[in-house]
């Protein structure tokens, strides 16, 4: 393929995730972005109490029942504005804290992120965790302060909190005029324009209650009354006291442009989307153990950042989500699966619009494709046109909670093993088989995961399982010479298990036991996290 065409296609890609604390409005914003992008027909009330439809990105049965996002959905849509023609890849991540591991891995597959802040609650615990994950990779962040149609905290106070708590500079790009019942719109600092808000006018794309050019325009006083003068004072203060936007600082992950709006009313969403495609980076280079992979290389490379079982329960399928890192994917191309050394023909890769899928004819760096997986593809696997690359930075965490699986019907043991194995391959839970028993022990980073697994076992595999507490306080992967690990198994084999990848894990009954065991076996590394490579 000519370099210019490859370059053109890659340069129009934007791949980002939305991060927030639960209930900040992330799912609503996701749906409104899809609506502005033309990917869905209506932007209705997402998960409203009486609504019969569910958010486009919350497709799993349990998510529909509970109203929280528990898996990362991937959605692709085209978007065109005055600046050009773009392909947007939006990764919706779980907001609930028990799903941080899945979110962490999803953030390895994006080039930028939108952070949603609730104007009523400000910076919350999960936002802090997720921003710290983005900071590890210097991911550029855009901030959307949501729910301006409610009585919230003062905008200047919110910016101060973001800067102090999250340690990132804020550069306001829009500024709200009032809030709650007196919310009248936003002022665009970059082009000196007031965009007026009227909830009745915001039902069509591009519709607005009106635009007024210039802060000194007398029309502003006529429309806003006393709020016009308040706005002028606010803007003078903001221009003097806050940071002006610096693209280099933004791309380095040190400054975030800030937009205000009300996602539920479609207000401010299009400005955010325009900023996202205009300011965010095109696909970035990715690190491997041997070299950096540049997106414009002509040979295809990609890595698996997520595995999802039963995206379509009718087909009992498993899909490996692959981030394309370089070159172009073509349907039917033969690729090396680096971990197995085998070459596979990828004939039926798919692209996503939440649960709607289409067969992928081609994809470029920045895109996410789904590769059907029959149990041979693992998290972190690399696919290339022959080069034995291993991408770095895809983490797996030691679980903090443990349960033993028990069946109500012992005849379903085979289905239980298969279900737990497949669900563990997704990486949100981990399955351990203790060497000293036939137990199946499940580990997770949060207790909600066990409810999710029990529900999915019943709904997707027809298995009724109970999860009982297990006498394990923490887990550590074992790394060392085979003879040293054999000695540990000889002395403390009752606490050693094998994980889904066949690696040895020490299941410590207490922190004291772990410390004493580490002292007794100083030549073995007891690892809390490890990279999936």
Curated annotation (Swiss-Prot):
GTP binds at residues 20-27, 92-96, 146-149. Keywords: Cytoplasm, GTP-binding, Nucleotide-binding, Plasmid, Protein biosynthesis. The gene is prfC. Pfam families: EF-G_D2 (PF22042), GTP_EFTU (PF00009), RF3_C (PF16658). This is Peptide chain release factor 3. Residues 11-284 form the tr-type G domain. It comes from Ralstonia nicotianae (strain ATCC BAA-1114 / GMI1000). InterPro entries: EF-G-like_DII, EFG_III/V, G_TR_CS, P-loop_NTPase, PrfC, RF3_C, RF3_dom_3_sf, RF3_GTP-bd. GO terms for biological process: regulation of translational termination. GO terms for cellular component: cytosol. Increases the formation of ribosomal termination complexes and stimulates activities of RF-1 and RF-2. It binds guanine nucleotides and has strong preference for UGA stop codons. It may interact directly with the ribosome. The stimulation of RF-1 and RF-2 is significantly reduced by GTP and GDP, but not by GMP. Belongs to the TRAFAC class translation factor GTPase superfamily. Classic translation factor GTPase family. PrfC subfamily. GO terms for molecular function: GTP binding; GTPase activity; translation release factor activity, codon nonspecific; translation release factor activity, codon specific. Its main location: cytoplasm. Transmembrane segments: none annotated.
């Amino acid at each position: 393929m000519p370099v210019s065409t490859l370059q053109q296609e890659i340069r129009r890609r934007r791949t980002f995730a939305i991060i927030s604390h639960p209930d900040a409005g992330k799912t609503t914003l996701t749906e409104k972005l899809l609506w502005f992008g033309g990917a869905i027909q209506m932007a209705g009330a997402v998960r409203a109490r009486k609504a019969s439809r569910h958010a486009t990105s919350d497709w799993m049965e349990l998510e529909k029942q509970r109203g929280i996002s528990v898996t990362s959905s991937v959605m692709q849509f085209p978007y065109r504005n005055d600046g050009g023609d773009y392909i947007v890849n939006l990764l919706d991540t779980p907001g609930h804290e028990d799903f941080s591991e899945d979110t962490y891995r999803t953030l390895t597959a994006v080039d930028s992120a939108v952070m949603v802040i609730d104007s009523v609650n400000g910076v919350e615990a999960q936002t802090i965790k997720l921003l710290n994950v983005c900071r590890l990779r210097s991911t550029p962040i855009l901030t959307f302060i949501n729910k301006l149609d409610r009585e919230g905290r003062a905008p200047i106070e919110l910016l101060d909190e973001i800067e102090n708590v999250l340690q990132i500079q804020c550069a306001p790009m829009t500024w709200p005029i009032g809030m709650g019942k007196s919310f009248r719109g936003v002022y665009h600092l970059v082009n000196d324009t007031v965009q007026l808000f009227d909830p009745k006018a915001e039902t069509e794309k591009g519709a607005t209650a009106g635009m007024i050019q210039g802060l000194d325009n007398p029309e502003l006083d006529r429309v806003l009354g006393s709020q016009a003068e308040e706005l002028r004072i606010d803007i003078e203060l903001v221009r003097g006291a806050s940071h002006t936007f610096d693209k280099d600082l933004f791309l380095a992950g040190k400054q975030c442009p800030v937009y205000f709006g009300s996602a539920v009313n479609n207000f401010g969403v299009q400005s955010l989307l325009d900023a996202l495609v205009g300011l965010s980076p095109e696909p970035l280079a990715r690190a491997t153990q041997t070299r950096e992979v540049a997106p414009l290389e002509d040979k295809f490379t990609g890595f698996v950042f997520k595995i999802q079982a039963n995206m379509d329960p009718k087909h009992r399928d498993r899909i490996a989500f692959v981030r394309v890192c370089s070159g172009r994917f073509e349907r039917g191309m033969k690729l090396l699966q680096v971990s197995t050394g085998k070459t596979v023909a990828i004939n039926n890769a798919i692209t996503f619009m939440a649960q709607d899928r289409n067969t992928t004819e081609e994809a470029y760096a920045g895109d996410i494709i789904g590769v059907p997986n029959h149990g041979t593809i693992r998290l972190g696997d690399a696919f290339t046109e022959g080069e034995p690359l291993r991408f770095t930075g895809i983490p797996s965490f030691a679980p903090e909670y443990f349960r033993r699986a028990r069946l109500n019907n012992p005849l379903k043991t085979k289905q239980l093993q298969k279900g737990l194995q497949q669900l563990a391959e997704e990486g949100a839970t981990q399955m351990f088989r203790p060497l000293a028993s036939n137990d199946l022990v499940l580990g997770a980073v949060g207790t909600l995961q066990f409810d999710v697994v029990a529900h999915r076992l019943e709904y997707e595999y027809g298995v009724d399982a109970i999860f009982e507490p297990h006498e394990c306080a923490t887990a550590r992967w074992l790394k060392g010479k085979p003879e040293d690990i054999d000695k540990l198994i000889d002395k403390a084999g009752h606490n050693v298990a094998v994980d889904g990848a066949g690696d040895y894990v020490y299941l410590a009954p207490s922190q004291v036991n772990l410390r004493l065991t580490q002292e007794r076996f100083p030549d073995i590394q007891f690892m809390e996290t490890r990279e999936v490579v």
